[in-house]
From Swiss-Prot:
Entry GO MF terms: glutamyl-tRNA reductase activity; NADP binding
UniProt remark on domains: Possesses an unusual extended V-shaped dimeric structure with each monomer consisting of three distinct domains arranged along a curved 'spinal' alpha-helix. The N-terminal catalytic domain specifically recognizes the glutamate moiety of the substrate. The second domain is the NADPH-binding domain, and the third C-terminal domain is responsible for dimerization.
HAMAP family registered for this protein in UniProt: Glu_tRNA_reductase (MF_00087)
Record-listed NADP(+) binding positions: G188, A189, G190, E191, M192, I193
PROSITE patterns in UniProt: GLUTR
Family, as annotated: Belongs to the glutamyl-tRNA reductase family.
Record-given protein name: Glutamyl-tRNA reductase
One Pfam short name: GlutR_N
Marked site positions, Important for activity: H98
General function of this protein: Catalyzes the NADPH-dependent reduction of glutamyl-tRNA(Glu) to glutamate 1-semialdehyde (GSA).
Species classification: Bacteria, Pseudomonadati, Pseudomonadota, Betaproteobacteria, Nitrosomonadales
Enzyme superclass (EC): oxidoreductase
Organism expressing this protein natively: Nitrosospira multiformis (strain ATCC 25196 / NCIMB 11849 / C 71)
EC assignment: 1.2.1.70
Length: 420
């Protein structure tokens, strides 16, 4: 039987700091290439990659898990020893449970947050498009989405949760008090920026500006917010005009450097700028935090705020874990039954060959005009002898130390009671 198994590995906000996570993230436009590289250069049959600001995880089907895990460092041109301390490896049942917990929001920085479910679905679509999603992973994610829906509909896991977007707004209010007098700049136009923009817009800031590489998408968001649009090229001149900056783009390199912020602060005559960088890899150079008049927060810095209200939801967590555990058992039953299918198929094929052989022999005897009753008797004897030959041979030739186990096994298979 093949030793190919379900396997998951990766890093997340619990095991690795931001400066490590950003080194192994996968931009959306590089996902297909990465998936092809993994299945082409490693003993991996199926693969899906989940890459968010808080995690990079690979779900795969492989018979050599160690080679699969080494790929992550190799692909990003990192020494394996540098990534090793932060990696988790989850074989079979642990991989299933982890997938269910992630989709249900139990493994998120924001407990119960719904965005991860959409991110998982995006990962599945990418794997489907790349042709790396086989039956095993398809079944896993199909069940994963079912479990996540059950958890969210049967528990209050998402109640009173503080999203990253809400946390950004709360932090801004702590620094400025009334956001209604502040000018807010959003860099990017993806889902996270849209969520943040909705929270800030509800506070009616003095002005909202959206900067994005694709102007059309920025215009659509700005229109909903009654804001204005600028291009990324205009950032050096426009930055000083804003009090609050929230950024989350898919750029692989920082777009806001220390020098640009120094010039902006000088132009603002040292009035403070509040910045939230929700991107991974980061949009803002970490050195910007060294500036006295810049309050820079990353996704990891928001952790304490998003944990507010966690104690009140421990009951919901216990309910969710129970739902997940039950579904893990069911999925493992399916997985284990799937692994014996080839053996069952081979057994049936062998029986079919016996049947056809005896049937053809009987037909030839009938064609010769021999007694049908004798032919039927001969056919039944032939089938009986063929079916019993191999187990009988195994019993007669078994080694002494394995004979008792073999007797027990055959007795159970054929419901025998030899001692009676």
């Amino acid at each position: 039987m093949s030793s190919t198994q379900l396997f998951a590995f990766g890093i997340n906000h619990q095991t690795a700091p931001l400066d490590v996570r950003e080194q192994v993230s996968f931009p959306a436009d590089a996902m297909e290439h990465a998936l092809h590289d993994l299945v082409s250069h490693r003993p991996v049959r199926e693969a899906a990659i989940v890459s968010t600001c808080n995690r990079t995880e690979i779900y795969c089907s492989t018979d050599k898990p160690d080679e699969a895990t080494h790929w992550l460092a190799d692909f990003h041109r990192l020494p394996t020893r540098e990534l090793e301390p932060y990696l988790y490896r989850l074989p079979r049942e642990k991989a299933v449970k982890h997938a269910f917990r992630v989709a249900s929001g139990l493994d998120s920085m924001v407990l119960g947050e719904p965005q991860i479910l959409g991110q998982l679905k995006d990962a599945v679509k990418s794997a489907e498009h790349a042709g790396t999603l086989g039956m095993l992973l398809h079944k896993l994610f199909q069940r994963t989405f079912f479990v996540a829906k059950e958890v969210r509909s049967s528990t209050e896991i998402g109640t009173n949760s503080v999203s990253m977007a809400a946390a950004s707004t709360r932090l801004a209010e702590r620094i400025f008090g009334d956001i209604g007098e502040q000018r807010v700049l959003f860099i990017g136009a993806g889902e996270m920026i849209e969520l943040c923009a909705s929270h800030f817009a509800a506070r009616h800031p003095k002005r909202i500006t959206v900067a994005n590489r694709t102007v059309e998408r920025a215009q659509a968001l700005a229109h909903r917010l009654n804001g204005q649009v600028i291009t990324l090229n205009e950032l050096p001149d426009q930055l000083a005009l804003h009090d609050i900056v929230v950024t989350c783009t898919a750029s692989t390199l920082p777009i806001l450097g220390k020098g640009m912020l120094e010039r902006a602060i000088k132009a603002r005559k040292h009035r403070p700028i509040f910045m939230v960088d929700l991107a991974v890899p980061r949009d803002v150079e970490p050195e910007v935090a060294e500036l006295d008049d810049v309050f820079l927060y990353s996704v990891d810095d928001l952790a304490d705020i998003v944990k507010e209200g966690l104690d009140s939801r421990q009951g919901a967590v216990a309910q969710a874990e129970a739902i997940i555990d039950s579904n893990v058992v069911n999925f493992m039953h399916w997985l284990e039954s799937r692994q014996v299918v080839p053996t069952i198929r081979a057994l049936r094929d062998q029986a079919e060959r016996y049947r056809r052989h005896e049937l053809e022999r009987a037909k030839k005897l009938l064609a010769k005009g021999e007694d049908p009753r004798k032919i039927i008797e001969s056919l039944s004897n032939g089938l009986t002898n063929k079916f019993l030959h191999l187990p009988s041979y195994a019993l007669n030739h078994a080694a002494e130390d394995e004979r008792d186990d073999l007797v027990d096994l055959i007795s159970r298979l054929y419901h025998l009671h030899p001692s009676e």
